[in-house]
């Protein structure tokens, strides 16, 4: 019986407690002049994720998107969205937990953030903006590789000294 209880405690658990919009901002610094120009924008997407432990096995993950559209050398709009979620995560190893917080949870949050950006851009009366899907697994793997390389660099310098 105790063995069954231990197995249940060690089984991975993942629950979404809440998904919410933490912060939004939409600016059209050059309106109404921007509406008079031919629409041929350069759109730039910056994204960031961060997480914080709220309690035992409870984490907040925040996905921040900043979308900037330049048209004819001027900023047409700047849209910022922070989409957040509270997740219960238990029974994972440290690397698995890091992957969940850095890739899996942002993947859950992205469709909500994408919809918020699209809605704000539409309310600004700009043409529809559909953000392409983001491969958070690949971004997280790249982040891990960069951290490993940064950790290896000082060790290599010490070995050469």
From Swiss-Prot:
Parts of the chain that traverse the membrane: none
Pfam families referenced in this protein's UniProt entry, alphabetically: SecB
GO process terms (BP): protein folding; protein tetramerization; protein transport
InterPro entries referenced in this protein's UniProt entry, alphabetically: SecB, SecB-like_sf
Cellular component terms per the entry's GO annotation: cytoplasm
Subcellular location, record wording: Cytoplasm
Keywords (A to Z) from UniProt: Chaperone, Cytoplasm, Protein transport, Translocation, Transport
MF-aspect GO terms: unfolded protein binding
Coiled coil feature spans: none
Stored SUPFAM superfamilies: SecB-like
HAMAP family to which the protein is assigned, alphabetical: SecB
Family: Belongs to the SecB family.
Complexes and interactors: Homotetramer, a dimer of dimers. One homotetramer interacts with 1 SecA dimer.
PANTHER family listed in its UniProt record: PROTEIN-EXPORT PROTEIN SECB (PTHR36918:SF1), PTHR36918
Known function: One of the proteins required for the normal export of preproteins out of the cell cytoplasm. It is a molecular chaperone that binds to a subset of precursor proteins, maintaining them in a translocation-competent state. It also specifically binds to its receptor SecA.
Name the record gives this protein: Protein-export protein SecB
Species name: Shewanella sp. (strain MR-7)
């Amino acid at each position: 019986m105790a063995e069954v209880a231990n197995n249940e405690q060690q089984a991975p658990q993942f629950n979404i407690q809440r998904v919410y919009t933490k912060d939004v901002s939409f600016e059209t610094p050059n309106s109404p002049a921007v509406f008079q120009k031919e629409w041929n924008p350069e759109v730039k997407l910056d994204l960031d994720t961060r997480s914080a432990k709220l309690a035992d096995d409870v984490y907040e993950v925040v996905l921040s998107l900043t979308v900037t559209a330049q048209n004819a050398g001027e900023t047409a709009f700047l849209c910022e969205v922070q989409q957040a979620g509270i997740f219960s995560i238990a029974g994972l190893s440290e690397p698995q937990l890091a992957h969940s917080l850095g890739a899996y949870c942002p993947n859950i949050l992205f469709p909500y953030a994408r919809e918020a950006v699209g809605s704000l851009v539409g309310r600004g009366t700009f043409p529809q903006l559909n953000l392409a899907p983001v491969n958070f697994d690949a971004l997280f793997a790249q982040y891990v590789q960069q951290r490993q390389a940064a950790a290896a660099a000082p060790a290599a310098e010490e070995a050469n000294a």
